[in-house]
Amino acid sequence: MKKRIWLGALLAIPVLAVLGYVGYAEAAYYRLEDRLALDVDHQQGDQAQPDTEYTLLSYNVGFLAYSADYSFFMDGGEESRARDPRAVETNGQGVLETVREVSPDYLFMQEVDVDATRSWHIDEVELLTGELADYNRIFAQNYDSPYLFWPLTEPHGASRSGIVTLSRCRVESALRRSLPVETGFSKFLDLDRCYSVSRVPVSNGRELCLYNVHLSAYTTDGSIATEQLAMLLEDMEEEYRSGNYVICGGDFNKDLLGNSGSIFGVSGEAYTWAQPFPEELVPEGISLTAPLDEEHPIPSCRNADKAYDPETSFVLTVDGFLVSDNVEVTGAQVVDTGFAWSDHNPVKLVFRLT
């Protein structure tokens, strides 16, 4: 009888541990309110000007963990954190060097940690923008997770992260919009998805509305990503119909080229998250700009199930832009970094307000 009692007690321990963790995760989970006003740090600069060429760079920096030989457990790889603080610093300096070379007027970044186990509690917002004091800066939080005890050998831990918008032109105000997310257990693995809207006054009395976005990838319900995109496009269309200029840039987690496997030579059939971008959702007056050099195609993203191999890694373009018709696009390209500092290459847009 005593053996049975002891055996029952031993079996109950892991069950209670799991139940306790689920309770902890549920208690810690929350979402930020919709239509949250965002602070504009270093507010400065002039109004934007029509018929002036500007450059926008969008860069998913991958919480500064992804050197070219890094693989991530949620992509089927092995690692769950940056290897050490030095790796975060090295990747951060690589990102900064790329930004300085492009010298954009506007800069969007995604997956920028503020305080996270996975990035050794380094404030990446300060690391990446501290030397860029001549930009207006807007931070929008899209991830504040409870401690994730997986993988067991090196848990991913707790994360607070977000998206960052920088602008040389003056930003009068900024707003955070909450996107639809899953409601099941997957909500603990996905982010508190959002986009930010930064309003830049233009000398002709209109506004340039800059949308920084990072849509869902790890979902069990494929309709969530469609709902997110539909909400974003409805908002953009409303601003365009009001006479404003509208540009959205970021990581859409969709194959913007529609057939990246054919273009880059490695099939994506095994990667169900890499679905074609649903262009049928894009309303009149808004268009998709997917950067592609047809003679020398460069992808914007690699699947991080293994170290990057140019010959065998699945690559695609998920980073790009949605632009209103009153914005003239004069150039768009993927900046080739060889995935040295992130699992993404940055994408660049050159444009004029007409």
Which sequence ranges carry the predicted segments?
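Surface-exposed cleft-lining segments at the edges of enzyme active sites
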Residues: 78-84, 112-114, 179-187, 214-223
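Short proline/glycine-enriched turn/loop segments at secondary-structure junctions
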Residues: 186-187, 307-312, 336-340
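N-terminal, active-site-proximal structural segment of metallo-dependent hydrolase catalytic domains
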Residues: 5-134, 139-160
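Beta-strand-turn-beta hairpins that frame and shape the catalytic cleft
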Residues: 46-56, 65-68, 159, 163-173, ...
